[in-house]
A protein has these predicted regions:
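Acidic/aromatic-lined carbohydrate-recognition and catalytic surfaces
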Residues: 3-149
Length: 149
């Protein structure tokens, strides 16, 4: 009886894509604002944050047409957190801060050199070696390289 009551309890939640978070890089990221948002939800008794898929998007930037069900879209990586982790030499400048719409192509172009720098520094870590041992990573990397060629 107690289990049935617990299962029937309602929870409060919100649906908001990560891309809608405030940002200084043109798209919401999984960075400081995301942590602040989750803390605000917790303080207000909201227990569920439903987001749109975070996978690498295909045609039309639709989150429902991803290139992979395992990989995450690099557009949501926080450049500030990469800097704080020591993976970037300098903090990235502000780019399209808190805009109302996302120019995905412009954001990708802006972030690419910083993500490449962070990647080159990350490849020397044990975390990277552990990540690349996951079975899907090699096949996905080959797929993306061929797609880009």
């Amino acid at each position: 009886m107690q289990q049935e009551r617990k299962a029937a309890m309602r929870e409060t939640g919100i649906l908001m894509p990560v891309s809608a978070l405030p940002s200084r890089t043109g798209v919401g990221e999984l960075g400081a604002y995301a942590y602040e948002f989750v803390e605000a939800l917790r303080e207000n008794g909201v227990k569920i944050w439903q987001i749109l898929p975070l996978n690498p998007v295909g045609y039309g930037n639709s989150p429902y047409q991803p290139y992979s069900s395992c990989a995450g879209d690099e557009i949501y990586i926080s450049l500030d957190l990469l800097f704080e982790a020591g993976l970037l030499k300098e903090q990235a400048p502000t780019f399209h801060e808190n805009v109302r719409t996302v120019d995905y192509d412009a954001v990708r172009t802006f972030k690419e050199p910083y993500l490449k720098e962070a990647f080159s520094n990350f490849t020397e870590t044990e975390d990277f070696r552990e990540f690349t041992r996951q079975p899907w990573v090699y096949e996905y990397a080959v797929f993306r390289a061929k797609k880009k060629a």
